[in-house]
Curated annotation (Swiss-Prot):
Keyword Transferase: no
Protein's name in the database: ATPase GET3
Main function: ATPase required for the post-translational delivery of tail-anchored (TA) proteins to the endoplasmic reticulum. Recognizes and selectively binds the transmembrane domain of TA proteins in the cytosol. This complex then targets to the endoplasmic reticulum by membrane-bound receptors GET1 and GET2, where the tail-anchored protein is released for insertion. This process is regulated by ATP binding and hydrolysis. ATP binding drives the homodimer towards the closed dimer state, facilitating recognition of newly synthesized TA membrane proteins. ATP hydrolysis is required for insertion.
Record localization: Cytoplasm; Endoplasmic reticulum; Golgi apparatus
HAMAP family hit by this protein: Asna1_Get3
UniProtKB keywords: ATP-binding, Cytoplasm, Endoplasmic reticulum, Golgi apparatus, Hydrolase, Metal-binding, Nucleotide-binding, Transport, Zinc
GO molecular function: ATP binding; ATP hydrolysis activity; metal ion binding
Family as reported in the entry's similarity comment: Belongs to the arsA ATPase family.
Main subcellular location of this protein, as a coarse class: cytoplasm
GO CC, one annotated term: Golgi apparatus
Organism: Meyerozyma guilliermondii (strain ATCC 6260 / CBS 566 / DSM 6381 / JCM 1539 / NBRC 10279 / NRRL Y-324)
Quaternary structure note: Homodimer. Component of the Golgi to ER traffic (GET) complex, which is composed of GET1, GET2 and GET3. Within the complex, GET1 and GET2 form a heterotetramer which is stabilized by phosphatidylinositol binding and which binds to the GET3 homodimer. Interacts with the chloride channel protein GEF1.
One GO BP annotation of this record: tail-anchored membrane protein insertion into ER membrane
Principal EC category: hydrolase
């Protein structure tokens, strides 16, 4: 390229049409801090809009990051009312699904009742499926807010996902296309077997088929939105080490194969130890980090590569997140901003 892209996420924060922002990477690289920081900057820059940060990682950390308890329902962040957070709890959601399945009807001989119970049993990838159900719900809310619906729904301008480690995230992003094909086949099958199932199930199956049609439409819309760069983008998070860089490259290749927009990488935990001669370990580690930063500069010359400092304490609480997140928009300068490394409030 003839020019270097800004090493910031300013283009994402200022983007006016983004509906979905995914933040992902290897475990332990700072995904939650990064996703929380992006959400905070979005909320600060657009105070008249509502934003939602969802954790799809079974090991929820949003409550720890904001020092505030979150659950399966969206709750506003204290001190930043136009940002809400929620943590999807797969076990609780599975329990609800099984309860609904057991109450499907009171006829123990109904074959559909057993099918529903089996479907809500031990399903591989249930974390991803439940996360996707949450996406479908918000797609429905978008439609309700765009129309004349009387339902009290909150239409969030942008939804940010604090995702599970790479493997879970990639399975989650495959779901729309996979489900779209599966529902299409199920629709064909239901057309052939519908009359027989209605005889067996007392006519209740018609409701299921109607719901399947509605789900298929919503899934198709999600698939379209996820592959539209004006609506969806993915932010990769890594640290400047070999394994993390390797995982990032693998993830980017996968995302490109899904036709998803990805042009931003956040590199966390950098030491910036050029003038730290008193700490040999810091200097040695910074030298190693610089080696991988140089490799990233070659590999990702057409990406926004954001370099974030390693701090002296954890980034917890809304005040600390506000301080730290500003470096997503204005590059960290160790000469000017070095004091911030030890300036965070202990929580």
């Amino acid at each position: 390229m003839d020019f270097e892209l800004e090493p910031t996420l300013e283009s994402i924060v200022e983007h006016d049409s983004l509906k979905w922002i995914f933040v992902g990477g290897k475990g332990g690289v700072g995904k939650t801090t990064t996703s929380s920081s992006i959400a905070v900057q979005l909320a600060l820059s657009k105070p008249n809009d509502q934003f939602l940060l969802i954790s799809t990682d079974p090991a929820h950390n949003l409550s720890d990051a904001f020092c505030q308890k979150f659950g399966k329902d969206a709750r506003p962040v204290e001190g930043l009312p136009n940002l809400s957070c929620m943590e999807i709890d797969p076990e609780a959601a599975m329990s609800d699904l099984q309860q609904q399945a057991s109450q499907y009807n009171n006829d123990p001989s109904d074959p559909m009742k057993n099918i529903m119970n089996d479907m809500t049993g031990s399903i591989p990838g249930i974390d991803e499926a439940l996360s996707f159900m949450e996406v479908l719900k918000h797609i429905k809310n978008q439609k309700a807010s765009d129309g004349d619906s009387d339902e009290k729904t909150v239409a969030y301008k942008t939804i940010i996902f604090d995702t599970a480690p790479t493997g879970h995230t990639l399975r989650f992003l495959q779901l729309p296309a996979t489900l779209e094909k599966l529902l299409g086949k199920f629709k064909q099958l239901s057309g052939k077997l519908g009359p027989m199932l209605n005889m067996l199930g007392g006519g209740q199956q018609q409701d299921i088929f109607e719901k399947m049609n509605e789900i298929q439409k919503n899934v198709s819309e999600v698939n379209e939105q996820f592959t539209n760069p004006d609506l969806t983008t993915f932010v990769c998070v890594c640290i400047s080490e070999f394994l993390s860089l390797y995982e990032t490259e693998r993830m980017i290749q996968e995302l490109v194969s899904y036709n998803m927009d990805v042009n931003s990488i956040v590199v966390n935990q950098l030491l910036f130890a050029d003038n730290d001669g008193s700490c040999k370990r810091c200097a040695s580690r910074w030298k190693m980090q610089q080696k991988y930063l140089d490799q990233m500069a070659e590999l990702y010359e057409d990406y926004h590569v954001v370099k974030m400092p390693l701090l002296g304490t954890e980034v917890r609480g809304i005040d600390n997140l506000k301080k730290f997140s500003k470096f997503l928009l204005s590059p960290y300068d160790p000469e000017k901003d070095g004091s911030l490394v030890f300036d965070m409030e202990e929580k």
